[in-house]
């Protein structure tokens, strides 16, 4: 038996399965014949007993109970071998199924590789044709036939003349020049009669902000407390009322040490109501104070943001001539008034 079990290696599983089925069939038939011979007293076939190879010393034509027991044990052994062969067959089927699936995947991959190879071959031929055409165009010097020639010509010979022509032919209106000159005039020249210590007129300003302008700007002004609190810069909330002044001690000590008076529950309720009534008034007063502080702090900012007043700058170079003309006009007016009075 062990030899037969160990033999199941290196040979097809179908041969072992067919052999085990035939052995099981032969032993079971012989066992049933022994049962019939015991029941009827008929003789057995000695050739079948020899084929079974039972460990019997004397093989007789008549069935005995000992022979029946040996046949049953032999049938059990053959059945075990047959069951082991079936298990191996099941494993073989699983492995064969996996092999078939892998073969299908390999076939699909082979098809994909073949299609990719064909596409690669087509692309290669297409690129070869394009390169050959471009080489011909480059050798012939026809820049209009291929894109490569156009790029090379643009890189080798930049069109500087055309760009210069565009710059020269570009028109600029006088209004644009005047407006631009007006914008930069306040920072490029000083006013007539400028003095270094005197403040500048509203139309003129220095090219860079001065110290006074920087000090009066928003960067040098301290923001109000509620703004500091909003950005997390204030350590104490100034808008909340302080309750320390309103809280009274529950014990009042008189002149003597022993005289200690404790307030009743009604008095405590009255004090709490008074404190609750005073809280909104204190909050309103503090909010008004904070608003006044913010307004006072924002006044320099508003003064900066307000547009400067227009100043009439007298740029007359000959004030004496103008004054004499004005005097003549006044004399004429006086003469006319006198004539009217005499009339």
Curated annotation (Swiss-Prot):
GO cellular component term, pick one: mediator complex
Function statement: Component of the Mediator complex, a coactivator involved in the regulated transcription of nearly all RNA polymerase II-dependent genes. Mediator functions as a bridge to convey information from gene-specific regulatory proteins to the basal RNA polymerase II transcription machinery. Mediator is recruited to promoters by direct interactions with regulatory proteins and serves as a scaffold for the assembly of a functional preinitiation complex with RNA polymerase II and the general transcription factors.
Cell location: Nucleus
Protein's organism: Dictyostelium discoideum
Annotated family: Belongs to the Mediator complex subunit 4 family.
Binding partners and assembly: Component of the Mediator complex.
Pfam families: Med4 (PF10018)
Keywords tagged on the record: Activator, Coiled coil, Nucleus, Transcription, Transcription regulation
Lineage: Eukaryota, Amoebozoa, Evosea, Eumycetozoa, Dictyostelia
Listed Low complexity bias regions: 271-316
Record protein name field: Putative mediator of RNA polymerase II transcription subunit 4
GO molecular function: transcription coregulator activity
Gene responsible for this protein: med4
Coiled-coil boundaries: 86-125
Record has Repeat as a keyword: no
Sequence segments annotated as region (Disordered): 247-343
Keyword Cell cycle: no
